[in-house]
Amino acid sequence: AQPEWITSDPDMRFKYGSIGAERDAGIPYWIFYVLPRMFPDKLPGPGGYAAFGVVWEEGQELPVGFSKKVVGFPRVANNCASCHTTSYRTQADAAPTFVPTGPNHTLNLWAFFRFLVDCAKDPRFNADNLMAEINLVTDLSFIDRLLYRFVIIPITRKRLLEREQQFAWLYRDDFPPWGRGRDDAMNLTKYFMIRWPMDDSFGPTDMPSLWNLGKYRADQGMRMNFAGDSHDAWSVVPPTEVVEIL
């Protein structure tokens, strides 16, 4: 379970709550933590994960839209808020105001997905190098050090390399980058989630806001999900997570 400061507040739940992605797509927390330190050359700019244009609230250990949950060991995954939390400033030097369910117009999701795969493809992604970086920032127990070195790191690399096939369309020269604030939601669903064979379809769109959903009338054929397959907001949440949330 996640801490009460997340589960007891609807806004915090939206921004940092788990939707179950940690099980299959989660990245071990300490690997996630050190990747920008090890591979700054693979980031789109300086600033660690901030280079991807994520929304990051002051004092939080993770950006908005990144959940942390223990599934055997702490893992990090994305939730809906990655793409659907926006920010604005009333003046150039003012602190940002964050708006949950707004479109994240600064997120470079294309670059983030490629970053994870490119790190795993690099020969520097190995137990010796990762453990050296992890040991600089935390003191793992003896058992955890063994698990990371001999189990967690090798399996993480294997799983990330498997994503290269699922994300092969991100590397096609005839497909341009999506741009900030955009994603190719249907191809993500087809190739990454349900693993359909790849075709030549390409359709990045602006990330939409999620507010005022009451205007969509399912009885008139207006479906909530962009794919048009459902009017149920819970349809993207694994059943085990629905039980836990309820």
Task: Give names to the regions the model predicted.
Residues 1-91, 100, 111, 115-246:
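Extended surface/linker regions that mediate inter-domain or inter-protein docking
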Residues 95-107:
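Short cysteine/histidine-rich metal-coordination sites, predominantly Zn2+-binding motifs
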